[in-house]
A protein has these predicted regions:
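Partner-binding and oligomerization surfaces adjacent to conserved cores of proteins
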Residues: 1-324
């Protein structure tokens, strides 16, 4: 198991499934990921529950409730790392090397527009030309001043913080937590009401979680993109997931959308929404031996919670010694 978990961590570290990749290429990488994980899912995974009407309803109705990370009691769960200093230094290196001035020079001469058209299409190139021609000279001069970029990096820092927070609150990704060890005193104490709850045993080895197949909203959902809901082992490391590149691309797309009314010019790693939720501290959490079910569904964005059919994967129930 430890060998597999090391291979899984290495796979996530080196693999990027870009949002603009050809379907054949992205499908190949998804299949590689599933072929690595599915044969290594333990026969028994356990979910500890307190005695509440919600837990009882899930059990009765054959559901697994997933939720956004912000609903977890641990406020540092799914907290990613972004290298703000690197971003700031990169921006000012570009500025100090005359990059901004050169950009404006090519705008004025028209040299930049064929490049934009080649990369992003004629429509965006025409919008860029129109914006440049309508920008007053005093505004252009202000953009060329170093104080503008100091203010820009300060505002960028605020945007980065907002995106880091959004990882925990974004309703596209919802989580359910499981463990390999039903006898863990730590898990009974913290997640089963201090031994007064219960634990459910699941066998997910043959669970065909292809998302849309089991989604109750599939007939009314306009987006039939595959939802790769499955279970993955948590990676215990004192190094958090470095989301610098993904978040900068997301922010850049956000800025470009506000300027050009276009979407997703820069590709984003689709595994970003997996990696963000699969890293936890080695020293504080390794004893949990946790696996996570990650649900990504575009038709379930109206709530912090989503119910996933358990497909009769429950094999046993264990009562805590203090259950009433």
């Amino acid at each position: 198991m430890e060998k597999f978990k090391k291979e899984f961590a290495e796979y996530l570290a080196r693999t990027f499934i870009l949002s603009n990749a050809p379907k054949e290429e992205s499908d190949k990488l998804w299949i590689e990921l599933n072929n690595l994980v599915l044969p290594n899912i333990p026969q028994k995974l356990f979910r500890f529950r307190g005695c509440s009407k919600y837990s009882f309803a899930d059990f009765k109705n054959g559901k697994i409730t997933t939720c956004v990370a912000d609903r977890f009691p641990d406020e540092y769960d799914s907290m990613v790392y972004v290298n703000k200093e690197y971003i700031k230094n990169t921006i000012f290196s570009f500025y100090n090397a005359g990059g901004v001035q050169a950009l404006y020079d090519t705008k004025g001469s028209g040299e930049i527009y064929p490049i934009i058209e080649q990369q992003f299409g004629k429509g965006l190139a025409d919008k860029a030309r129109l914006i440049n021609e309508s920008t007053p000279t005093e505004i252009q001069q202000r953009i060329l001043d170093t104080s503008y970029w100091e203010q820009f990096t300060d505002e960028l820092s605020i945007l980065i913080d907002a995106h880091i927070k959004n990882i925990r609150t974004n309703r596209f990704t919802k989580i359910a937590c499981f463990t390999e060890d039903v006898q863990s005193q730590y898990m009974w104490d913290n997640y089963a009401g201090g031994y007064s709850g219960f634990a459910l045993e699941y066998d997910f080895r043959n669970l065909a979680f292809n998302g849309c197949e089991v989604c109750p909203k599939v007939k009314e959902c306009e987006e039939h993109s595959k939802n790769f809901t499955s279970v993955y082992p948590v990676i215990y490391s004192e190094t958090r997931y470095d989301a610098t590149d993904s978040i900068i691309n997301l922010i850049t797309n956000q800025i470009l959308k506000s300027i050009f009314s276009t979407t997703n010019l820069l590709p984003v790693d689709l595994l970003h929404w997996y990696k963000s939720h699969l890293y936890k501290g080695q020293n504080g959490y390794a004893q949990e031996k946790e696996w996570r079910m990650l649900s990504h569904c575009p038709s379930a964005m109206d709530s912090d919670f989503t119910e996933i059919p358990d497909r009769q994967c429950i094999k046993a129930i264990y009562y805590g010694p203090k259950i009433k």
